[in-house]
C-alpha cells in the first residue's frame, strides 16, 4: 500500500548508501521469508517463496522453498565447507536425492540470473551500491525519494535510481525501485526494470529478523528439522 507524497525529492545517493551500509554493518545474521522473481532468457519466471537463514561469518545460507513451484526443496551453503559446494535437494518425490554442486553449476543456474552465493541482503546492497556509484562517477544518475509505502507490514521509504536508457546495458537495469525500512534502514525490497519497463528482478524480505540467534546447527545438514 503506497502513500506517495507527491513530487519526488532529490536525495544525496552517496549519503544514502553510506547510511544503508552502516546499518547492514551492524547485522551479523538474519532470518526472513525471501521473495524472489527473475526474468531469465526473456521469460518472467514464477515467484519463489523461501525460508531464509543467513549468517555473515562464515558466509552461510539455509534455504527452504515453502511454496510451489519448488516447495520442499532445501539448500545449504557454508563458505569453505563441503569443498565450497552447495548441498541441495528438490521437494516431492526427489527429496531423497541430494546433490553437492558448485554454486555456478548449470543445475543451480538454470532458473537463476546469479549464483546462490549472491543470495541475501548483503549482496543486494553491494549490487545497488556498485551500480549507483558507477553512475555517480559517470555523472548520469537520477536518484530521488518518491514517498512512503508499507511493505510486509513495515513502514518504508521509496528510493528510485534511474540510469540512462541508452546505457542501460552498462548497468543491471534501467530503473531500480528500493524500499528501505524506516526503522532499521535496511533495504527491504528492490525491483529492477529494464529500458522497456519490464520487471527483471524482484527481491523482498518479509518477517525480517536482524541479528537472529543462529548457531552452527542451523547450517548443518544433520539438523533433524532438515531433510538432507
Give the ranges of each region predicted by the language model.
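An acidic-aromatic
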Residues: 43, 50-123, 198-201
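Gly/Pro-enriched, hydrophobic low-complexity segments
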Residues: 10-11, 39-41, 86-87, 106-228
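N-terminal functional modules and adjacent low-complexity/disordered segments of proteins
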Residues: 6, 12, 94-96, 181
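N-terminal leader/targeting segments and the immediate start of mature chains
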Residues: 2-47, 53-59, 67-69, 140-144, ...
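Extracytoplasmic
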Residues: 25-29, 47-49, 58-60, 70, ...
Amino acid at each position: 500500500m503506497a502513500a506517495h507524497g507527491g513530487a519526488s525529492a532529490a536525495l544525496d545517493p552517496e549519503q544514502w548508501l553510506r547510511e544503508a551500509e552502516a546499518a547492514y554493518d551492524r547485522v551479523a545474521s538474519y532470518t526472513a521469508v525471501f521473495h524472489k522473481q527473475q526474468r531469465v532468457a526473456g521469460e518472467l519466471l514464477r515467484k519463489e517463496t523461501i525460508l531464509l537463514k543467513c549468517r555473515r561469518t562464515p558466509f552461510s545460507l539455509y534455504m527452504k522453498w515453502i511454496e510451489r513451484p519448488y516447495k520442499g526443496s532445501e539448500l545449504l551453503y557454508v563458505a569453505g565447507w563441503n569443498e565450497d559446494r552447495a548441498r541441495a535437494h528438490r521437494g516431492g518425490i526427489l527429496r531423497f536425492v541430494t546433490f553437492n554442486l558448485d554454486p555456478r553449476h548449470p543445475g543451480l543456474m538454470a532458473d537463476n540470473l546469479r549464483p546462490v552465493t549472491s543470495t541475501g541482503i548483503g549482496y543486494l546492497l553491494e549490487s545497488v551500491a556498485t551500480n549507483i556509484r558507477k553512475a555517480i562517477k559517470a555523472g548520469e544518475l537520477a536518484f530521488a525519494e518518491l514517498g512512503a509505502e508499507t511493505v510486509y507490514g513495515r513502514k518504508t521509504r521509496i528510493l528510485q535510481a534511474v540510469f540512462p536508457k541508452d546505457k542501460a546495458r552498462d548497468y543491471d537495469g534501467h530503473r531500480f525501485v528500493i524500499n528501505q525500512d524506516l526503522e532499521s534502514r535496511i533495504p527491504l525490497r528492490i525491483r529492477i526494470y529494464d529500458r522497456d519497463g519490464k520487471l527483471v528482478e524482484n527481491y523482498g524480505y518479509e518477517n525480517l529478523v536482524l541479528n537472529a540467534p543462529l548457531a552452527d546447527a542451523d547450517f548443518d545438514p544433520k539438523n533433524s528439522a532438515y531433510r538432507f
